[in-house]
Amino acid sequence: MALRPEDPSSGFRHSNVVAFINEKMARHTKGPEFYLENISLSWEKVEDKLRAILEDSEVPSEVKEACTWGSLALGVRFAHRQAQLQRHRVRWLHGFAKLHKSAAQALASDLKKLREQQETERKEAASRLRMAQTSLVEVQKERDKELVSPHEWEQGAGWPGLATAGGVCTEGAAEEEEEAAVAAAGAAGGKGAEEEQRDVEVVAAPVEAMAPPVEAGAAPMETQFPHVEARAASMETTEKLERILLQLLGDADQEKYTYWGQKEGDLRSVETATSYFSGTTNPWSRASSEPLPVQLPASYSYSYSSPFSSFSDIPTISPPQATVTAPVPPQLPSDWEAFDTSLWSDGGPHRIDHQEHPRDRRYSEPHQQRPPVYRRPGDWDCPWCNAVNFSRRDTCFDCGKGIWLQKPH
């Protein structure tokens, strides 16, 4: 008996059906043999063998019928086995789906935890950033308080820095002016101690009031101090200072005045300090010894009476253009050796008292040389009195004659 009713893998659930199929296969011995031989094969191969048997004409009909019933039993068995495999696959897919679902839930939980962690970290970072910004603002405020510029501090304190700086910067110039004023007052001869002290104070006061030199790279004084416009009047102070010096030095000898002309370079420091406020600049190059051309009006004529008229005749000239050069000192008689032809005053030649000015004797000795006169570009020598004048002056501060006048021949 090929089919067994107790075999669940046969695919048949009823025993009478199994008995009927076994009876049909038992009509020929080939029926049960065909069933047992092909029980492990696939349905396609079983069908191919059955087709070969049915097409063979030499095979009897009983064999063909028994093989056909065996093929039917194998087909049911293969169908039952395929159903079992399908159920196993479905159960596996259900389990796999559950696994995916649980994995997705776990991933969602992890993602939620990660988002919460990131949000917490973001809030902490934002809090630290705000604290850092607050600390930075406080540090900047402390730095600004510590790094307040001296000018801003002077603004808050009533501008004490200008007077202090002016006193420091002009201290050296003031001392030199005082020494020069004392020497000039001593040369005048007719003044007492009180008058000399008063003259020195008058000379030194405008110098100390001058503005200090401005350092390179410093900000413009107009933007630092509100009272810069008042400093513009320092030019007038300089003019007054020169007039005072001329009055004090009116009776001094030419050597004294020549020495004072050499000290004019010291007065340059004061002029430089004032020229900053008036917007003028002085170059620091060497002075040229070339003649200075001066344009004169075409219709101008001037007749000048020289104090040395006994030595030369003064013609009347009216040139359209003149050249001012350093004049050659006139040749004086031998009996004039004891005199100094100073043109700084209107008194003419004066007798030099060597006992009155002992410290100026070093310039009269032949083996001593006068210190050089320091010049700047544009400074000019007066053709009449040989005094050195600043480039900004149009008239000689000694004799009062203009640069545009032709020197008498």
From Swiss-Prot:
Record's keyword terms, sorted: Metal-binding, RNA-binding, Transcription, Transcription regulation, Zinc, Zinc-finger
Zinc finger boundaries on the chain: RanBP2-type: 376-400
Tissue and organ distribution: Testis specific.
Top-rank taxon, per record: Eukaryota
Compositional bias ranges of the Basic and acidic residues kind: 348-368
PROSITE patterns the record matches: ZF_RANBP2_1 (PS01358), ZF_RANBP2_2 (PS50199)
Region feature (Disordered): 347-374
Residue sites binding Zn(2+) per the record: C382, C385, C396, C399
Family note: Belongs to the TEX13 family.
Function statement: Binds to ssRNA containing the consensus sequence 5'-AGGUAA-3'. Plays a role in transcriptional repression. Required for rapid sperm motility and timely degradation of mRNA via its interaction with CNOT1.
Subunit structure comment from the entry: Interacts with CNOT1; the interaction may inhibit CNOT1 binding to mRNA and subsequently CNOT1-mediated mRNA degradation.
Protein name: Testis-expressed protein 13A
